[in-house]
Amino acid sequence: MHDLKALRADPAAFDAALARRGLSPVGQQLVSDDEGRRAALAALQEAQGARKALAKEIGLLKRQKLDTAEIEAKAVALRDQIAGLEERANTIQTRIDDVLKSLPNCLDASVPDGKGEDENVVVHVRGEKREFAFEAKQHFELGEALGLMDFPTAAKLSGTRFVVLRGALARLERALGQFMLDTHTTEFGYSETSVPLLVNDDAMYGTDKLPKFAEDSFRTEDGRWLIPTAEVPLTASVMGEILPADALPIRMTALSQCFRSEAGSAGRDVRGMLRQHQFTKCELVSVVKPEDSDAEHERMTQAAETVLERLGITFRRMLLCAGDTGFGAAKTFDLEAWLPGQKAWREISSCSNTRDFQARRMNARYRAENGPAFVNTLNGSGLAVGRTMIAVMETYQNEDGSIDIPEVLRPYMGGLNRIG
């Protein structure tokens, strides 16, 4: 949600921010609507005052046993006027709210202009692409040949975009999640949290998933939502709160199942585990004071990078351009892993600073020196477990189809150093 007071002060600047995302100007119309709303509220207050005065006068006349018919008629007229003004103010407010709810976050000045992912900027590359003496296979070729990645059974059970992992691959998935949690909790101070996988409308709206992304999520018959990411319950845990200043920063992490309908993804990544309806992800969320937001964004991104570095996965950090930055983000870094089997860079983490965009939607504040102020919220993947497993499989594959286990994962694998 946006600050209407700031918008009123400079609607042209607001429209310029929207233009960076390729959106049409709405600032002046919002200001005009807000002026109409304020005028209706002022007239409403005046009419309510007049009606209150008439009520006193009617009471006085009745005590004196005098005729009140004329004044009561005025009171009835005022009642109807008040109802009309209330309806007008509410109608305008709803119109303003509907527009504001539909508008994405304003981008940071440091976000480069651009229309899509081809115009994202490489910040740095870590590691070297492994050279193979054989033709590297894709993860699903490796997994199926080992008999440990079963798509037909998953399709029988649930349809497309699901997988059944067996044996050592199932254990590898679990090991990766545990390794991520251990890294983030012991080295970066995130508090491990177990969260519900079902949330209500308020949690989804507050974390900018509703109304825009309703089609991308699964809704149950009782109106709750399967979480598309643990960002939703972690961030929404401070919804409606006024936090003590000394409680910040709050850093939380959760390893959870995530559920996405993948609406609009028909024909994309149909083979393998890259794009699924259900997947495991280690999520990072920070709640901070506004002045600490930029440093926290860098810290969070480095935490995600640390996992990739320890695993020996070649990756690059990308600064997303205006046209590729998500709806709720002011600035986003993506981490893309090199997949030798695909011969392509693929997103494995996305770390975003939403500034106070989510906080305004959630009414999440802290006790600042001059009164309650909105917190800043940040979220990031630390990492997507399935995609990290894909990177491990393709990076550490051998010519015979076996897969070496990265050294840091071996304690989580009972000392196993190779699959296959």
UniProtKB/Swiss-Prot annotation:
Where does it primarily localize? cytoplasm
Quick one: which residues bind L-serine?
T229, A230, E231, E283, S381
Family matches, as SUPFAM superfamilies? Class II aaRS and biotin synthetases, tRNA-binding arm
Q: Which reaction does it catalyse?
A: tRNA(Ser) + L-serine + ATP = L-seryl-tRNA(Ser) + AMP + diphosphate + H(+); tRNA(Sec) + L-serine + ATP = L-seryl-tRNA(Sec) + AMP + diphosphate + H(+)
Would the keyword Iron be found if you checked this record's keyword annotation?
no
User: What GO terms in the biological process aspect are recorded for it?
Assistant: selenocysteine biosynthetic process; seryl-tRNA aminoacylation
* One Pfam family linked to the record: Seryl_tRNA_N
UniProt GO MF annotations: ATP binding; serine-tRNA ligase activity
Give EC number(s), comma-separated.
6.1.1.11
Q: Which domain of life is it from?
A: Bacteria
Q: List UniProt keywords, sorted A-Z.
A: Aminoacyl-tRNA synthetase, ATP-binding, Cytoplasm, Ligase, Nucleotide-binding, Protein biosynthesis
Question: Where does this one sit in the cell?
Answer: Cytoplasm
- If you read the UniProt record, what top EC class would you report for this enzyme, in one word? ligase
The positions annotated for binding ATP are R260, S261, E262, E347, I348, S349, S350
A GO CC term assigned to this protein in UniProt: cytoplasm
Question: Which pathway, metabolic or otherwise, does it act in?
Answer: Aminoacyl-tRNA biosynthesis; selenocysteinyl-tRNA(Sec) biosynthesis; L-seryl-tRNA(Sec) from L-serine and tRNA(Sec): step 1/1
Entries under HAMAP family matching the protein? Ser_tRNA_synth_type1
Q: What is known of its domains?
A: Consists of two distinct domains, a catalytic core and a N-terminal extension that is involved in tRNA binding.
Quaternary structure per UniProt? Answer: Homodimer. The tRNA molecule binds across the dimer.
Q: What family classification does the UniProt entry report for this protein? A: Belongs to the class-II aminoacyl-tRNA synthetase family. Type-1 seryl-tRNA synthetase subfamily.
Q: What does this protein do?
A: Catalyzes the attachment of serine to tRNA(Ser). Is also able to aminoacylate tRNA(Sec) with serine, to form the misacylated tRNA L-seryl-tRNA(Sec), which will be further converted into selenocysteinyl-tRNA(Sec).
Q: What is this protein called?
A: Serine--tRNA ligase
Q: Which organism is it from?
A: Gluconobacter oxydans (strain 621H)
The record's gene field reads serS
